[in-house]
């Protein structure tokens, strides 16, 4: 079946306008971005093929330029467009967190942290510095490590928190293995940071561990 033979309400753009973006499948959303198919495949068929070939929509989005462009129907122009869309999405999430509002949505915070850390190949330790009303003052990647570990120094965290005049912190780091379950080392360093920051009356509100498509909150586990 070609797109021309589909009823209007089944066309991705028309379906989005009538029912909203949530009603569309991953392939239909990607089809709107791609706009055209290739010889022998309409744009929806091409989108479905690409998602299956890459393994998921996320893996397609995180592919390198070389990996992306070697697929039929894709090229450098589409790669540039996609990177621009992803960067705008990340900036939107960052702006939402930094616009001066208090952090009241753990899910939104988790979504932003995941967008920053999820696809990094090396472990990185990320901090949101907050004021006494839990508004974001500053965010930083403070430490980066090897593929499986980052050296986190409590003295440096305290120093940066005092520099930003922070009243509270939210911590996050990624597991490049993709497994979000916190290790005993993760729990130990979190406890050391809680104790060190407590000496200067700065609280840790949460520590998120970001994996592949999942994340774990220390606060939700009752560990903070």
UniProtKB/Swiss-Prot annotation:
GO annotation terms (biological process): proteolysis
Q: Which residues bind Zn(2+)?
A: 173, 175, 186
Q: Which UniProt keywords apply?
A: Hydrolase, Metal-binding, Metalloprotease, Protease, Zinc
Q: Which InterPro entries match?
A: MPN, RadC_JAB, RuvA_2-like, UPF0758, UPF0758_CS, UPF0758_N
Q: Which Gene3D superfamilies match?
A: 5' to 3' exonuclease, C-terminal subdomain, Cytidine Deaminase, domain 2
- The MPN domain extends over 102-224
Which CDD domains does the record associate with it?
A: MPN_DUF2466 (cd08071)
State the Pfam families in the record.
RadC, UPF0758_N
GO MF term list = metal ion binding; metallopeptidase activity
Family according to the record: Belongs to the UPF0758 family.
Annotated protein name in UniProt: UPF0758 protein VIBHAR_00653
Annotated organism of origin: Vibrio campbellii (strain ATCC BAA-1116)
From the broadest rank down, the organism's phylogenetic lineage runs: Bacteria, Pseudomonadati, Pseudomonadota, Gammaproteobacteria, Vibrionales
């Amino acid at each position: 079946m070609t797109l021309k033979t589909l009823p209007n309400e089944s066309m991705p753009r028309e379906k989005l306008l009538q029912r909203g973006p949530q009603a569309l499948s991953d392939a239909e959303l990607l089809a709107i971005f791609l706009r055209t198919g290739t010889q022998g495949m309409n744009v929806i068929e091409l989108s479905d093929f690409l998602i299956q070939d890459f393994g998921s929509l996320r893996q397609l989005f995180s592919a390198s330029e070389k990996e992306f462009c070697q697929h039929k129907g894709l090229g450098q122009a589409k790669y540039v467009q996609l990177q621009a869309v992803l960067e705008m999405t990340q900036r939107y999430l960052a702006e939402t967190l930094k616009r001066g509002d208090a952090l009241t949505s753990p899910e939104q915070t988790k979504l932003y942290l995941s967008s920053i850390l999820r696809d990094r190949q090396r472990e990185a330790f990320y901090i949101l510095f907050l004021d006494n009303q839990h508004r974001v003052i500053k965010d930083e990647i403070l430490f980066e490590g090897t593929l499986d570990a980052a050296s986190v120094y409590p003295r440096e965290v305290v120093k940066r928190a005092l520099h930003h005049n922070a009243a509270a912190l939210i911590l996050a780091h990624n597991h490049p293995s993709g497994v979000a379950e916190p290790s005993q080392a993760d729990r130990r360093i979190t406890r050391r940071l809680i104790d060190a920051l407590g000496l200067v009356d700065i609280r840790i509100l949460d520590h998120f561990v970001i994996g592949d498509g999942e994340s774990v909150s220390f606060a939700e586990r009752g560990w903070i």
